[in-house]
UniProtKB/Swiss-Prot annotation:
One of its GO terms (cellular component) is ATP-binding cassette (ABC) transporter complex. It is an enzyme of class 7 (translocase). Its main location: membrane. Coiled coil: none annotated. It is found in: Cell membrane. Its EC number is 7.2.2.7. Belongs to the ABC transporter superfamily. Fe(3+) ion importer (TC 3.A.1.10) family. It catalyses: Fe(3+)(out) + ATP + H2O = Fe(3+)(in) + ADP + phosphate + H(+). Residues 6-236 form the ABC transporter domain. The keyword ATP-binding applies. It comes from Streptomyces coelicolor (strain ATCC BAA-471 / A3(2) / M145). This is Fe(3+) ions import ATP-binding protein FbpC. It comes from the Bacteria. ATP binds at residues 38-45.
Length: 348
C-alpha cells in the first residue's frame, strides 16, 4: 500500500468524559478518495474537524505528509474544507469567494483571476465570476464552494456532508461529476457522509464508524460484499440479519435451516441473507410467510414478509412477479446470497 499523506494515530477526543473519537487509526494515501460513513453521533464529523485543526485531540496525533500537526492552527494546515451548508461569503461575488484562499496566501491579482477562471471551468460554471452568490441555485453554490476549497491547492480536500442539502437527482449527478473531477486532478479527499449511496459512488475506500471507532474499512465492493458485523450490515440497509449456529453447509437460524457457502466459517455466527437470496415460492413450500408490504425500487420490488414466529424478511422480486400484500407465500434461501459474518464482529 502506498505511504499515507494523512495519518491519524490513536486519535482521541473526549466530550465530558465520553470518547467521541476513540483511539482511531486511519491513513489516507495521496490521490486516494476516502469516505467516512456512519450514523449521527458516530464521530465522523469530529474526525474531520480534528484533521482540519478545528477540534484539538485529547490523545494521539494527526500527521500530514509526515509532519505532526499538533499546534498547527487550522489556517496554516494545507487542507481545504467544504461544509454541507457551503458557508460562502454573501458580501462577495463568485470570483471573490474563490479568490479568497489564494489572496490570503499572497497570490497576485493576475494569479487570482487566472485561478478563478480555471476553477470555474473545472466545476462547470464558466462566466459566473461576477454573479452574486445569493442568485445561485443550490447546485451552483455547491460548485462554487468546491472551487473555493480547491483554489489554494490544498494537499488534502475535506468534505463534510458535501451534497447533504441537495435534492436526490442533483446529488446523484454531482457525485459522478465529483468523482470524475477528483480523478482528473489527482485530488486526495477525506469526506464524511451518512449517505451510503453517496459514499459508495465517490470513494476508493469506505470507512464505517460506530461510537467513535472504526467498525470496518475497505473498498466499496469489500464492504458491500462482506460487512464486518451485524451493525455494518444493518447500517448498509440489509434487514435479513440474525444470529445463527453454522455446521457444515447449513446455518440454524430463526428462519430454520439456511444453506451457506462451502467455505463458510463454523460455529456461533451472524448470518446475512441478501434480499436477492430470499426466493418466493408457493405457500406449501419452504418457510411459510405473509406479505405485509411492497416497496417499488425501480429495478425490482422489495417484498416484506412476516414468517410465523420469526423475524421479518425482505425479498427482491421481479417487477411483474411480486406477490400482493396479504398473500400467503413460501420462502426458500439461496446459499450464494448468504454471508456468514464473525460472531464477534470481526470479518472472517
Amino acid at each position: 500500500m502506498p505511504p499515507s499523506l494523512l495519518s491519524l494515530e490513536g486519535a482521541t477526543v473526549r466530550f465530558g468524559g465520553r470518547a467521541v473519537l476513540d483511539d482511531v487509526g486511519l491513513g489516507v494515501a495521496e490521490h486516494e478518495v476516502v469516505c467516512v460513513l456512519g450514523p449521527s453521533g458516530s464521530g465522523k464529523s469530529t474526525l474531520l474537524r480534528a484533521v482540519a485543526g478545528l477540534q484539538p485531540l485529547d490523545a494521539g496525533r494527526v500527521t500530514l505528509d509526515g509532519r505532526d500537526q499538533s499546534g498547527v492552527p487550522a489556517h496554516k494546515r494545507e487542507v481545504g474544507l467544504m461544509f454541507q451548508d457551503h458557508q460562502l461569503f454573501p458580501q462577495r461575488d463568485v470570483a471573490g469567494n474563490i479568490a479568497f484562499g489564494p489572496r490570503m496566501r499572497g497570490a497576485s491579482r493576475a494569479e487570482q483571476q487566472a485561478r478563478v477562471a480555471e476553477l470555474l471551468q473545472l466545476v462547470g460554471l464558466p462566466g459566473a465570476a461576477r454573479r452574486s452568490v445569493a442568485a445561485l441555485s443550490g447546485g451552483e453554490q455547491q460548485r462554487v464552494a468546491l472551487a473555493r476549497a480547491l483554489a489554494p491547492r490544498p494537499r488534502l480536500l475535506m468534505l463534510d456532508e458535501p451534497l447533504g442539502q441537495l435534492d436526490r437527482s442533483l446529488r446523484e449527478r454531482l457525485v459522478v461529476e465529483l468523482r470524475e473531477l477528483f480523478g482528473r486532478l489527482g485530488t486526495t479527499v477525506l469526506a464524511v457522509t451518512h449517505d451510503q449511496g453517496e459514499a459508495f459512488a465517490l470513494a476508493d475506500r469506505v470507512v464505517v464508524m460506530r461510537d467513535g471507532r472504526i467498525a470496518q474499512s475497505g473498498t466499496p465492493l469489500e464492504v458491500w460484499q462482506r460487512p464486518a458485523d451485524a451493525f455494518v450490515a444493518r447500517f448498509l440497509g440489509f434487514e435479513n440479519v440474525a444470529e445463527a449456529s453454522v455446521a457444515g453447509q447449513a446455518a440454524d437460524t430463526p428462519w430454520g435451516k439456511v444453506p451457506v457457502p462451502e467455505d463458510a466459517p463454523q460455529g456461533t455466527r451472524t448470518v446475512l441473507v441478501r434480499p436477492a437470496g430470499v426466493r418466493v415460492v408457493p405457500a406449501d413450500e419452504g418457510l411459510r410467510c405473509t406479505v405485509t408490504a411492497r416497496t417499488f425500487r425501480g429495478t425490482h420490488v422489495a417484498v416484506h414478509l412476516q414468517p410465523e414466529g420469526a423475524p421479518r424478511l425482505e425479498a427482491a422480486c421481479a417487477l411483474r412477479a411480486a406477490p400482493e400484500v396479504g398473500a400467503a407465500v413460501g420462502v426458500e434461501f439461496d446459499a450464494a446470497d448468504v454471508v456468514v459474518l464473525g460472531g464477534s464482529g470481526v470479518p472472517e
